[in-house]
Amino acid sequence: MDYFTLFGLPAQYSIDLPALTIRFQDLQRQFHPDKFASGTPAEQLAAVSQSATINQAWQTLRNPLARAEYLLSLHGFDLTSEQHTVRDTAFLMEQLELREELDEIDQAKDEARLESFIKRVKGMFDSRHQQMVEQLNNETWDVAADSVRKLRFLDKLRSSAEQLEEKLLDF
C-alpha cells in the first residue's frame, strides 16, 4: 500500500495537510505498539512495523520535497539513483558560483550580504518549486524529476546559508 492510500489521500502532490495530520493521529492511536503490549509476539511485531510505516509515511508526505520524490517514485523515477543526476551544466555552474559566493560571505563575515543572499536563494527555490508543482499537476514526470533534483541543490544551499547565518549571529 502506498503512503497516499495509507492516509486516504489522492496520489497527487497537492494534499490536504490538516487532513494528513488528523489521519496520522488516528492511525497512530489505532496501531500504537503499546496497545498490543499484551498481544502475542507476532502481534507486537506487526504493530511496531505498522507504526514505523505510518511514521515514515507521515514524514515523507508532510515534507514537500520528500513528497514530490515519493510521488515520482510511484511513477518509476528513482531519484536516489546515481544515474539520475542533474545534467544541466548551466544550472550546475550557477550552483558552483553561488557556493563560492557563500564562501566569500563567510570569509568576510558580511551579515547584510548574507541576508540578501538568503532572500535570493529563497526566491530561486520558490520559483523552481512553483514550476515543479505545475509539472507534477500536469503529470510531466520527467521534467518534474529534473526540477526536484535542482530543488535539492537549492535546498542544501539554503540550509548552508541559514547555518552560516546562525554562526554569524552567535559571533
Curated annotation (Swiss-Prot):
<dbReference type="InterPro" id="IPR001623">
    <property type="entry name" value="DnaJ_domain"/>
</dbReference>
<keyword id="KW-0143">Chaperone</keyword>
<dbReference type="GO" id="GO:0001671">
    <property type="term" value="F:ATPase activator activity"/>
</dbReference>
<dbReference type="GO" id="GO:0006457">
    <property type="term" value="P:protein folding"/>
</dbReference>
<dbReference type="InterPro" id="IPR004640">
    <property type="entry name" value="HscB"/>
</dbReference>
<dbReference type="InterPro" id="IPR009073">
    <property type="entry name" value="HscB_oligo_C"/>
</dbReference>
<dbReference type="GO" id="GO:0051087">
    <property type="term" value="F:protein-folding chaperone binding"/>
</dbReference>
<protein>
    <recommendedName>
        <fullName>Co-chaperone protein HscB</fullName>
    </recommendedName>
</protein>
<dbReference type="InterPro" id="IPR036386">
    <property type="entry name" value="HscB_C_sf"/>
</dbReference>
<feature type="domain" description="J">
    <location>
        <begin position="2"/>
        <end position="74"/>
    </location>
</feature>
<dbReference type="GO" id="GO:0051259">
    <property type="term" value="P:protein complex oligomerization"/>
</dbReference>
<dbReference type="Pfam" id="PF07743">
    <property type="entry name" value="HSCB_C"/>
</dbReference>
<comment type="similarity">
    <text>Belongs to the HscB family.</text>
</comment>
<comment type="subunit">
    <text>Interacts with HscA and stimulates its ATPase activity. Interacts with IscU.</text>
</comment>
<comment type="function">
    <text>Co-chaperone involved in the maturation of iron-sulfur cluster-containing proteins. Seems to help targeting proteins to be folded toward HscA.</text>
</comment>
<dbReference type="InterPro" id="IPR036869">
    <property type="entry name" value="J_dom_sf"/>
</dbReference>
<dbReference type="GO" id="GO:0044571">
    <property type="term" value="P:[2Fe-2S] cluster assembly"/>
</dbReference>
<dbReference type="GO" id="GO:1990230">
    <property type="term" value="C:iron-sulfur cluster transfer complex"/>
</dbReference>
